[in-house]
């Protein structure tokens, strides 16, 4: 009887014993300060956006989120200056009209560390950001590009990480911007009315 009690007491002590620190084996998400957007080979030249028919490409390295693979999401952002202060979404949401956008997203959400875009898309975006019309479009302009990275979670997103900024020299041209055509949805059912 004493032997069983002693054995039970010894086993229960072993169950409650634990390592002093077991964090070394658990992966920990670390948010890096920055990551690298590779300078494209066309960055040293002036890109004529009107005559460029091939797509332009960007590539970057995945941020180091602690040494293990993470399914990060990326968005390519373009700015008319090197500031990246007010986004197009923030300016659109401002009811007073006091905020003017100085950057906008060139891409939708990406999961690869590369992106191909058309010169026309870049031209339309910088024309919209600068508010150019046919009379005041410049022969040459500087455009600044960076990549935003984040990890989507069920509660939203983690901290956002931004890449370095790459300066591109472009020769823009005028494109008449127009509002997008409305999407018509033909819905059927009692809940629609």
Residue spans of the language-model regions?
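Insoluble glucan recognition modules
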Residues: 17-77, 83-193
């Amino acid at each position: 009887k004493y032997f069983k009690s002693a054995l039970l007491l010894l086993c229960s002590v072993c169950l409650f014993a634990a390592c002093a620190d077991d964090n070394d084996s658990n992966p920990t998400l670390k948010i890096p300060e920055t990551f690298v957007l590779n300078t494209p080979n066309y960055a040293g030249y002036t890109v004529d956006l009107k005559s460029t028919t091939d797509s332009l490409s960007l590539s970057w390295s995945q941020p180091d989120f602690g040494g293990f693979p993470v399914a990060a999401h990326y968005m390519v952002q373009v700015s008319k200056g090197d500031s990246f202060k007010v986004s197009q979404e923030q300016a659109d949401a401002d009811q007073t009209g006091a905020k003017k956008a100085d950057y906008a997203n060139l891409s939708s959400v990406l999961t690869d560390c590369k992106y191909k875009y058309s010169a026309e898309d870049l031209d339309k975006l910088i024309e919209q950001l600068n508010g150019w019309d046919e009379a005041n479009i410049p022969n040459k302009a500087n455009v600044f590009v960076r990549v935003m990275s984040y990890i989507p979670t069920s509660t939203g997103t983690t901290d956002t990480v931004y890449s370095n900024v790459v300066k591109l020299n472009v020769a823009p041209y005028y494109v008449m911007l127009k509002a997008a055509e409305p999407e018509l949805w033909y819905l059927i059912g009692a809940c629609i009315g």
